[in-house]
Amino acid sequence: MDNVKNEKTTDFQKTEEERSKKEVDRLWKEIGWHRPLGGMLYNYLLLLVVMLPGILVVSVVVPNFIMPYPEAVGFYNVTLSYLQVIFFAADFGLKNASERYIAEYAETKPKKAIRYVSFFIWFQMITGLIQITVISAFSIMILPQTDMGYAVWFFLVYIMVQWPGTIGIFQVALNGFQQFDKANILYVIQNFAIQVLTAVGFIFLGRWYGIQNPQIGELMGATMGFIVGMYVDDLIGLLLGMYFLNNTLRPFGLTLKDAFIISYDKKLAKQVLWYGGRVMPSGLSFYAVSFLITLMLTAWLPNYSTLIGLYYIASTLVGALSMTFPMTAPLSESYNNNKKELSLYLIRMQFIWWGILTIGFFLIPVLLMFPLILLRIGGEFAEASWMIFPLFIPAFLLFPSNFAGIICEACDLPEQSTFMNFIEQGTRLLTYFLVLNPDFGILLLVGRENVVYFWLLAEAPGYIAKGFYGWFIVKKKLFPHNKIDIPIWQTFFIPFLAMLPEIPFVIAMVGVFNLVFALNQILGFIILGIFLISMLYLMPAYVLMPMFGFLGGWDEK
């Protein structure tokens, strides 16, 4: 009798669990802010497990023990600038187009959505082989005759990322199906766990090879290892993306195999290429201008490889200020189904949470804690600490400037997003030219030793020009009869006031770290890890968010 009773209890519990799971799935599929927010919060929890150790390795271990050469990072970024313009032109805007259409059909017609994935995969694999062939021939026959002759092997190794070249589609597909938790897991694991491990391992291998072969040298060997590590990281990320997408497709009666089967037709290919062709000039202008700026830097900026390497470290730390939510899919789903008020709600919530993250969570660590810590433990990269402050201004302007373009792309106005980027890139190119040109402009007024400060601020004018035009278009073209009503007070002022109590705590933390680090470096690093956890988790939970609510951050007006 007891056995029968226990079996009934177990069956009842299983039934309740199944009902609960179905209810959770039903609520999750409802349109709203909970999906972007849930994805972000899920991602934020991963910081402690994966990203925090990655930050410590990149900011402490790498510059002190693994790759104490800012020049190696500079050479890598120069190579990237030369090749990315070609990569993006060959991609033909398919990433943007795929995310737009996958998001539209993911819930209503998943089999149609997977056809866009299939087209992206086959297009990328075929064009990737063409790119590898052409650029390899260029690198072997022409590049040695130029000032970039030292970078021949950098080009030959890095071009391999274009085959199979499909890693991006799995991130796009997960976002399109609004599986932001899986997309965030993929992003964090690849960019902070796998990337660190592969980069460290291959940098050591490259340095060893350079020492064994003096004609190459340790610096060039480290650079080569760094680039190889990036490629291996992409291959591992590709396998992870395939695994996550396969799990996402199962509830729809689909598998990863369906993504590799040629299921698209001429009409779909034409639709995607037409949309991508309208979006592509926007992104292409960025990479083309970045390429021209790289030419200016290598020609006019003394010691460019070191400065570019330091710039990369500083901009990576400042990049936390631009943390946003994946908004293309929810905005596309709401606006293209004639739910404008929902679209406006999503826009307002994005602003509020951007303010919470940028000003509340990251402003104090980025501007106060990171520079002081980097100065102490950064080794050859310590000089990047002074770059953080001028880079803060363009980093803070980036989101308001870019968000208008994201809205236009999601709401089927890609040509306006393209024009916004033309405005930004035109202003950007002119600004860098006026800053770096040795014959006239700012350099003559401030001197060569001070022009670096203006170089660090050179992105800001383009963001400002793009932002003014972008929000004018969003209002005029998309919401002419609706009030956008950006929550200025809740976005900027309340997060700033809410984080002020953290300042004395951070100053005290830095003082304790310096004292302990001087006595015992290992114990100092442990203290640093505890401080980072406090700033990223404890202070927001027990100081920032209660203060945000107390000051009226969640009030409707």
Residues covered by each model-derived region:
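Membrane-interface helix-loop junctions in multi-pass transport and translocation proteins
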Residues: 178-182, 192-243, 415, 425-468, ...
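Transmembrane helical elements of multi-pass membrane transporters/channels
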Residues: 39-62, 225-249, 262-329, 333, ...
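Specific pore-lining/lateral-gate transmembrane helices of multi-pass inner-membrane transport
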Residues: 104-120, 310-419
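Signature of the first transmembrane helix
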Residues: 2-96, 132, 136, 158-161, ...
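Membrane-proximal transmembrane or re-entrant/amphipathic helices at the cytosolic face
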Residues: 1-24, 251-258, 507-557
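Interfacial segments at transmembrane-helix termini and the short loops linking adjacent helices
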Residues: 140-157, 366-398, 445-450, 480-481, ...
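Interfacial/gating helices of multi-pass transporter permease domains
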Residues: 35-36, 58-85, 151-152, 216-227, ...
